[in-house]
């Protein structure tokens, strides 16, 4: 997995860029529910100094706030639908602006081609690369059902809806970036420590300077 990683993509501040003159490196982290994205993002944060922005966590925080926006998001998630791009992009933008870091892992977004195009058009940011955690549905289902303190939406029917949404919506995003040689594919069915060895090889150019 020690392939050469694309140079970080930095974006000059332009009028349309909602981040102002802030230059950032963004890595999209994609993979099905239960593929281990969250665990590995935590490792990347610790070892390589990135800030982890989970689209799902940001959406759940909005739900918890009790806002009208949060109620709409909650209903869509229960139905296994994808939240409108502008809602998630606004949450991600706000998080990047507020954070002093300039290296971000965006986990679980873009979820579809419309998300992807909207993110690039609104923020003027193109990812340095896409980290794709590839894992079978059988293994992901086993992991999700085996969680001691699973999320409230971790029941088998909802899990399978989430798999279906991922396959139909997210795989075209991965194919789009693969055509640009921007996808770094990880075998996520392996044990956590082995997966991280593969991740470390990809992120070596981003090692923190002590």
From Swiss-Prot:
Source species: Oryza sativa subsp. japonica (Rice)
GO cellular component term of the entry, any: nucleus
Cofactor: Mg(2+)
Cofactor, how bound (note): Binds 1 Mg(2+) ion per monomer.
Positions of CMP binding: 115
Gene3D superfamilies to which the protein is assigned, alphabetical: P-loop containing nucleotide triphosphate hydrolases
Protein name: UMP-CMP kinase 3
Claim: Nucleotide-binding is one of the keywords in the record: yes
Oligomeric and partner information: Monomer.
Sequence positions that bind a ribonucleoside 5'-phosphate: 60, 81-83, 108-111, 151, 162
Domain notes: Consists of three domains, a large central CORE domain and two small peripheral domains, NMPbind and LID, which undergo movements during catalysis. The LID domain closes over the site of phosphoryl transfer upon ATP binding. Assembling and dissambling the active center during each catalytic cycle provides an effective means to prevent ATP hydrolysis.
GO molecular function: (d)CMP kinase activity; ATP binding; CMP kinase activity; dCMP kinase activity; UMP kinase activity
Keyword terms of this UniProt record: ATP-binding, Cytoplasm, Kinase, Nucleotide-binding, Nucleus, Pyrimidine biosynthesis, Transferase
Record's keyword annotation contains ATP-binding: yes
Record-listed ATP binding positions: 34-39, 147, 190
UniProt family annotation: Belongs to the adenylate kinase family. UMP-CMP kinase subfamily.
GO BP term, example: UDP biosynthetic process
Matches recorded under InterPro entries: Adenylat/UMP-CMP_kin, Adenylat_kinase_CS, P-loop_NTPase, UMP_CMP_kinase
EC number(s) from the headed UniProt entry: 2.7.4.14
Source species, domain of life: Eukaryota
Subcellular locations according to the entry: Cytoplasm; Nucleus
């Amino acid at each position: 997995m020690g392939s050469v990683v694309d140079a970080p993509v930095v974006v000059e501040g332009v009028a349309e860029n909602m981040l102002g003159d802030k230059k950032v490196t963004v890595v999209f982290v994609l993979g099905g529910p239960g593929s281990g994205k969250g665990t590995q993002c935590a490792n990347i944060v610790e070892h390589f100094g990135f800030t982890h922005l989970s689209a799902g966590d940001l959406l759940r925080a909005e739900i918890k706030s009790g806002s009208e926006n949060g109620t709409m998001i909650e209903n869509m998630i229960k139905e296994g639908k994808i939240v409108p791009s502008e809602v998630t992009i606004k949450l991600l933008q706000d998080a990047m602006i507020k954070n002093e870091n300039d290296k971000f892992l965006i986990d679980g977004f873009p979820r579809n081609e419309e998300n992807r195009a909207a993110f690039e058009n609104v923020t003027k940011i193109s990812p340095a690369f896409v980290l794709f955690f590839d894992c079978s549905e059988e293994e992901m289902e086993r992991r999700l059902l085996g969680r001691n303190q699973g999320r409230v939406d971790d029941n088998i029917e909802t899990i399978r809806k989430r798999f279906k949404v991922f396959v139909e919506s997210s795989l075209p995003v991965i194919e789009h970036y693969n055509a640009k040689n921007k996808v770094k594919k990880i075998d996520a069915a392996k044990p956590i420590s082995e997966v991280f060895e593969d991740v470390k090889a990809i992120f070596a150019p981003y090692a923190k300077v002590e």
